[in-house]
Amino acid sequence: AALPVDTDQRIPPLNILSKQLGISVATLREQLEEARSMGVVEVKPKAGIRKLPYDFSAALKPGLTYAMHGGCISYSQFADLRKHLETVYFIEAAQSLDYQVINYLDDLVTSTLTTIKETPGKVPVKAHREFHTLIYKDLKNQYLNGILEAFWDVYHLSGLEVYPDFTYIERVWQYHARIVEQIRNCNYSAGLSLLIEHMDLFNQREKPIQRLTFE
């Protein structure tokens, strides 16, 4: 965070940075790679090194990736943390949403339901992630938003998928529609109840897909 940058958040080349900080170029390369893995900087040919805005989910991802691949933590524990955070913050988050965001959520639900009906072989994973994370964005809590974003990365890394039972998927998005309706009508407690019902339904349908190994 204390690295010297210009107005475009560009960081000097390593040879210059080495002189400014009194650190060897080899050590800086190691630190740069670590910073890049945490989403602190980006490195591009010709463009050089640029410091990125802080993203807590990017900082979490390397550790979570290691933990999931190494079997150090269980998916269910992280999913339970996500569930509790969403439910605890839901009413505060819903009250913070303006009509523009509510209308966007409404449109997202409508377009996704249409896609499910017209293209039943397509699972709306990206839309599902956006629906759940967008509700909490206006709280501007980087730690909360980072963990909620990281949940979807962990879900992907875990190898857990929802079987393409599209009657079930449509039901999930009908829950989303009802949640948005309650938010629009300022019935926040009712919206929270629907969110909890939806999450219980979602958790019941999560099944691991066994990974095949070949010797």
Located regions from the model:
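Short linear motifs at protein or domain termini
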Residues: A1-L81, L212-T213
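Short loop-to-helix capping motifs
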Residues: L14, K140-Q142, C186-N187
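Hydrophobic, amphipathic alpha-helical faces that serve as interaction scaffolds
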Residues: Y66-H69, L81-Q100, L113, K126-F166, ...
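Amphipathic alpha-helical segments enriched in hydrophobic/aromatic residues interleaved with Lys/Arg
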Residues: V101-T115
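C-terminal all-alpha effector/ligand-binding and dimerization domain
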Residues: L113, A150-E215
